[in-house]
C-alpha cells in the first residue's frame, strides 16, 4: 500500500549571489526536497562524509542570513514510505559527500533533481540550476566567491555537531584506555618478588 506523499521542491533565493549574476540574466538558487514534512538538501564541507542535511521545510533562517525563501514547486507524489526515503537519502549521501560539492558541477540543485527523479520520476525545473548550465561560459564565477558562501549554515552546524561527537567518542576511548592501563599498572605493582 503506497503512501502517496507530495514531493515539493523548496527554492531559496541566494540574493547575495544574485546581486552579481542577475545583470547577466542568471539567478542563483538553493533548493531542497520536501516530503513527509521534512526537507532534505545538500551542501559542501571539507570532509569525506555526506553533505546531505535536513531543515524545517521552507525555513530559510536555518540556511543562514543570506538565503531567502522564494517558492515551493510541487513536483509530484511518491509511494515510498518515510523509512524508505531515509534509506534513499543515506544511499545518496555516499555520492553527495561534502567534499565533492562543486557550485557548478555537483550542487544542491543536482541533489534535489536526483532525489526528485527517484521519488516521483521528475527532474527539477531547469531555471533553478541555470548557473550550472552557464558555468562553461563563466568559469571564473566560483573563484570570485568567498568559500563560506558555498556552505549553508545548517550544514555547518550539522558538520560541527558530527565532528564534536567524533571528538567526544575519541576522548572517551582515550580515557577508557588510560583507566584500563592505570588499573593494569596498579595490579602489577602489587605483585611481590618471591
From Swiss-Prot:
Its EC number is 3.4.19.12, 3.1.2.22. One of its GO terms (molecular function) is deubiquitinase activity. Gene3D superfamilies: PPPDE domains. It is found in: Cytoplasm. It comes from the Eukaryota. Its main location: cytoplasm. The keyword DNA damage does not apply. One of its GO terms (biological process) is proteolysis. It holds the Pfam family Peptidase_C97. Keywords: Cytoplasm, Hydrolase, Protease, Ubl conjugation pathway. PROSITE patterns: PPPDE. One of its GO terms (cellular component) is cytoplasm. Residues 5-149 form the PPPDE domain. It catalyses: Thiol-dependent hydrolysis of ester, thioester, amide, peptide and isopeptide bonds formed by the C-terminal Gly of ubiquitin (a 76-residue protein attached to proteins as an intracellular targeting signal); S-hexadecanoyl-L-cysteinyl-[protein] + H2O = L-cysteinyl-[protein] + hexadecanoate + H(+). It is an enzyme of class 3 (hydrolase). The active site is at 30, 108. Residues 166-194 are annotated as: Disordered. PANTHER family: DESUMOYLATING ISOPEPTIDASE (PTHR12378), DEUBIQUITINASE DESI2 (PTHR12378:SF6). Interacts with RPS7. Has deubiquitinating activity towards 'Lys-48'- and 'Lys-63'-linked polyubiquitin chains. Deubiquitinates 'Lys-48'-linked polyubiquitination of RPS7 leading to its stabilization. Exhibits palmitoyl protein thioesterase (S-depalmitoylation) activity towards synthetic substrates 4-methylumbelliferyl-6-S-palmitoyl-beta-D-glucopyranoside and S-depalmitoylation probe 5 (DPP-5). Belongs to the DeSI family. This is Deubiquitinase DESI2. It comes from Rattus norvegicus. The gene is Desi2.
Amino acid at each position: 500500500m503506497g503512501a502517496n506523499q507530495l514531493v515539493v521542491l523548496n527554492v531559496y533565493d541566494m540574493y547575495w549571489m544574485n546581486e552579481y549574476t542577475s545583470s547577466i540574466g542568471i539567478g542563483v538558487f538553493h533548493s531542497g526536497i520536501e516530503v513527509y514534512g521534512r526537507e532534505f538538501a545538500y551542501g559542501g564541507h571539507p570532509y569525506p562524509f555526506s553533505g546531505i542535511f535536513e531543515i524545517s521545510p521552507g525555513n530559510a533562517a536555518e540556511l543562514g542570513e543570506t538565503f531567502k525563501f522564494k517558492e515551493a514547486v510541487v513536483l509530484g507524489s511518491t509511494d515510498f514510505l518515510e523509512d524508505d526515503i531515509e534509506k534513499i537519502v543515506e544511499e545518496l549521501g555516499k555520492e553527495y559527500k561534502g567534499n565533492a560539492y562543486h557550485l557548478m558541477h555537483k550542487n544542491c540543485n543536482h541533489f534535489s533533481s536526483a532525489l526528485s527523479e527517484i521519488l516521483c520520476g521528475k527532474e527539477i525545473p531547469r531555471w533553478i540550476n541555470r548557473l550550472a548550465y552557464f558555468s562553461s561560459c563563466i568559469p571564473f564565477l566560483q573563484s570570485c566567491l568567498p568559500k563560506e558562501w558555498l556552505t549553508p549554515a545548517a550544514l555547518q552546524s550539522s558538520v560541527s555537531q558530527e565532528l564534536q561527537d567524533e571528538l567526544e567518542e575519541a576522548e572517551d576511548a582515550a580515557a577508557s584506555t588510560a583507566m584500563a592501563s592505570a588499573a593494569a599498572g596498579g595490579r602489577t605493582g602489587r605483585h611481590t618478588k618471591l
